[in-house]
Amino acid sequence: MGASGPVIANVLVDHPEAVLCNPEEMTAQRELWVSVCPNKKELIGIIEKFPASFFTSASHHNNQRNNIAYFQSLNLNKRIITKLMASAPQSFSRPVEQNQVMVDTLQRSYLELGGEKLNMKIWLQKLLSQNPFVLLKSAEALRQNLLFLRDRGFTTAELLHLLSKLRGFVTELHPDSMNQTLQYSQEMMACSGDELREIVLKCPALLYYPKHILTERFEGLLGAGISVSQIIDTPTVLELTTQIVNYRLQKLAAHGYDARTGSLDVLNGTKKDFEQSYGKLRLRVERPLFNPVAPLKTYD
């Protein structure tokens, strides 16, 4: 395949069991992978990064072949199929019928929640790309969680929004844990059921966090002087750990920004998002904006 010596060495260090594969198994496996990833350079990169996904038992080859054919029948992009094989090899080692059940459930849920059939393939590709492990989850868990959220008053359009935003991780939730999380959040924010649903739609990840994590984060924010109304306006701040919140508050305060009286949007987001917001704020402080309507000085 043209792999270099260092690449082969890395593969053997990470997955020494590769030496147990005989040439016939290697040839069969290579043919399977080339059917979805014909670019040899890309395939070598995948093998180096996910050696255990490539060097699998010959007993799995029939299941792998059937699963590849199934996903190709869905007209999924080859890159998506390759990513699934590399990131979640267990889903290709098992009988194809198990993947069919989960995919059918996802597609049915998408359509029942008002999704357009024309866009279903794109939606499914995006979901599988973001969370390849969704195929290994229980289809019944997905149905039960959607039913629970429907009973909490979420409309079909809102449920589709949550299913898309949660990237299939809704299968990892449980009605009891979600119920505890929602009850605690409603108590802390003293909001109505309708207001709570709006908060969840702004911050779907809120459904993930158990009570003890939310308790720590609420206490951290309130202890730093952030008000409940600010949290309601920008609930995604609850996705940040207390340590990250305190660090960002200190950096903002160093440049004269008081988050207790301003918007929490600048505090929010990933590290990259924050650095960009922080950089813009610092520039505004260090370089006063030009006022285009101020009278110009004239000289006689």
Regions found by a protein language model. Name each.
Residues 1-300:
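Long amphipathic alpha-helical repeat/alpha-solenoid cores
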